[in-house]
Amino acid sequence: MSNDNTSVNEFDFQLVCEYFSSLERQGPGSPEMTSKALSFVESLTEAAHIADIGCGTGGQTMVLAEQTSGVITAIDLFPSFIELFNKKVEVKNLQDRVKGVVGSMDNLPFQNEELDLIWSEGAIYNIGFERGLKEWRRFLKTGGYIAVSEASWFTEERPAEIEDFWMNAYPEIDTISNKIAQMEKAGYVPVATFLFPETCWTELFYVPQMLAQETFLNKYVGNKAAEGLVAYQRYEAQLYAKYKEYYGYAFFIGKKISD
């Protein structure tokens, strides 16, 4: 597939949802990365209220639930993701403090200064890194933390093919240093930043898609939209293999220290 200025957001909503529902993770990441980011967050008690925004089916949320003792409210726009999320919660018997709710990240169901921690892995791009940081800040208590993972450039210059792909897919992609500056501008003190290893993209995201793609295509034989979605995901994986030294995911952890 060539870069024809298509982005995954342009595919059929229900098809995208069904495709990614079959995956443990809906973006690059790992339990180890979630745990590492959480290690920079201090003073979470049983009374803490955590929000996981753009939670998907909850791979990272279950890690948070295992390693914290507070209440977790997880938000996602896709009802089928939340259905799967809440089934995981039931299996783990966490219903007393973890719940998934269908909702939009630009209309969150929280009060000002209600949250001790805002979490968002591979999802803040849906609203935009800068906008999300600014708009979500009011929900955090003073002393609260925000932890988000975000696609970022590793270099100042890139080959045209990968530059064009990301400018179409997510124009707000930027360098690590610029992302940290944006976090500061939004009113946070940067606490930590670290890069994801390649395995978070390959073994834990693209490889699991291979089997899912075959199952998906067998279900939708002759469906051009389904074929196009799979072709796009395969193209994205090929680009990562070719240009991984130029970009990847990074975690950004910040703290709100004043109103």
PLM regions: where:
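Conserved Class I S-adenosyl-L-methionine
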Residues: 192-259
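Short, glycine-/aromatic-enriched active-site segment of Class I SAM-dependent methyltransferases
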Residues: 151-170
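Conserved alpha-helix/loop element of class I SAM-dependent methyltransferases that forms part
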Residues: 27-46
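A short SAM/SAH-binding and catalytic strip from SAM-dependent methyltransferases
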Residues: 117-130
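A short glycine-rich, Lys/Arg-flanked "PGG" loop and its adjoining helix->strand segment in the class I
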Residues: 131-145
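A short acidic, Gly/Pro-enriched loop at the edge of an enzyme's catalytic core
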Residues: 106-117
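Short alpha-helix
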Residues: 172-187
